[in-house]
């Protein structure tokens, strides 16, 4: 029984219906046409791959902000946080992480703390790599206060293909960095909003691993933006 439980743990529950449907159709196709059946099983395997839900080695530290998603850090800029979270007109550092269809799409809590507010905003489905996606696309915004008293926000943004955002959080939840809290289906983006004086530990173009990559450290003084060299 434990083996079956472990098997289900490595696949996010949002994928169960898709995987079962793909598998059923594949068996039906295989009974009529071997090539079509083979294509169906390949699609089923891809579906399992997309909804994979791997464990991660989460860095420990109350001052740390961990990447909430797998993907490429597409942009780091100063921007206004989502108005619905009530953070006012003061700009924050926005770290945007773009997920393609091959990335793990399970999202994780970026820091230890408490959830203060949640807001779902229906919207468009522009390509998530575009800057305007942060403003116009369907999104789920979350405001939290870290254990060190810092207010940060993180936002799940639907993309061109994505059509469903899942967020399992509720207001007043006590959360830990690296905990799974949701998923965005089929291509998307996650934005993290941090206070302006936050010391960042990542750079544009870097690949982030959700639940593992440290994107900021409140315990450090802010310095010039880090520079990285490809080798």
UniProtKB/Swiss-Prot annotation:
GO molecular function: phosphatidylserine decarboxylase activity
Localization annotation: Cell membrane
EC number in record: 4.1.1.65
Gene Ontology biological process terms from the UniProt entry: phosphatidylethanolamine biosynthetic process
Residues bearing the modification Pyruvic acid (Ser): 188
Topological type in the membrane: Peripheral membrane protein
Modifications made to the protein after synthesis: Is synthesized initially as an inactive proenzyme. Formation of the active enzyme involves a self-maturation process in which the active site pyruvoyl group is generated from an internal serine residue via an autocatalytic post-translational modification. Two non-identical subunits are generated from the proenzyme in this reaction, and the pyruvate is formed at the N-terminus of the alpha chain, which is derived from the carboxyl end of the proenzyme.
Cytoplasm recorded as keyword: no
Catalysed reaction equations from the record: a 1,2-diacyl-sn-glycero-3-phospho-L-serine + H(+) = a 1,2-diacyl-sn-glycero-3-phosphoethanolamine + CO2
Membrane-spanning parts: none
Co-factor binding details: Binds 1 pyruvoyl group covalently per subunit.
Annotated site location: Cleavage (non-hydrolytic): 187-188
Entry annotation: catalytic residues: 188 (schiff-base intermediate with substrate)
Keywords associated with the record: Cell membrane, Decarboxylase, Lipid biosynthesis, Lipid metabolism, Lyase, Membrane, Phospholipid biosynthesis, Phospholipid metabolism, Pyruvate, Zymogen
Assigned protein family: Belongs to the phosphatidylserine decarboxylase family. PSD-A subfamily.
Assembly mode: Heterodimer of a large membrane-associated beta subunit and a small pyruvoyl-containing alpha subunit.
Protein's recorded name: Phosphatidylserine decarboxylase proenzyme
Annotated organism of origin: Rickettsia bellii (strain OSU 85-389)
Gene that produces this protein: psd
């Amino acid at each position: 029984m434990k083996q079956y439980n472990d098997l289900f743990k490595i696949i996010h529950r949002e994928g169960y219906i898709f995987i079962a449907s793909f598998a059923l159709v594949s068996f039906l196709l295989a009974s009529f046409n071997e090539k079509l059946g083979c294509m169906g099983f390949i699609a089923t395997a891809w579906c399992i791959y997309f909804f994979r839900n791997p464990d991660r080695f989460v860095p420990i530290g109350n001052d740390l902000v961990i990447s909430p998603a797998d993907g490429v850090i597409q942009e780091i800029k100063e921007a206004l946080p989502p108005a619905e979270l009530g953070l006012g007109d003061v700009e924050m550092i926005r770290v945007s992480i773009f997920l393609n269809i091959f990335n793990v799409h399970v999202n994780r809590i970026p820091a230890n703390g408490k959830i203060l507010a949640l807001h779902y905003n229906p919207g468009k489905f522009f390509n998530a790599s575009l800057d305007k996606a942060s403003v116009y696309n369907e999104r789920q915004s979350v405001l939290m206060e870290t254990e060190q008293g810092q207010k940060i926000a993180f936002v799940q943004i639907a993309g061109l293909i994505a059509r469903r955002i899942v967020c399992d959080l509720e207001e007043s939840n006590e959360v830990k960095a690296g905990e799974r809290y949701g998923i965005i289906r089929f291509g998307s983006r996650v934005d993290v909003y941090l206070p302006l004086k936050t010391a960042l530990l990542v750079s544009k173009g870097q690949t982030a691993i959700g639940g593992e990559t440290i994107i900021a450290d409140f315990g450090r003084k802010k310095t010039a933006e880090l520079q990285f060299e490809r080798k």
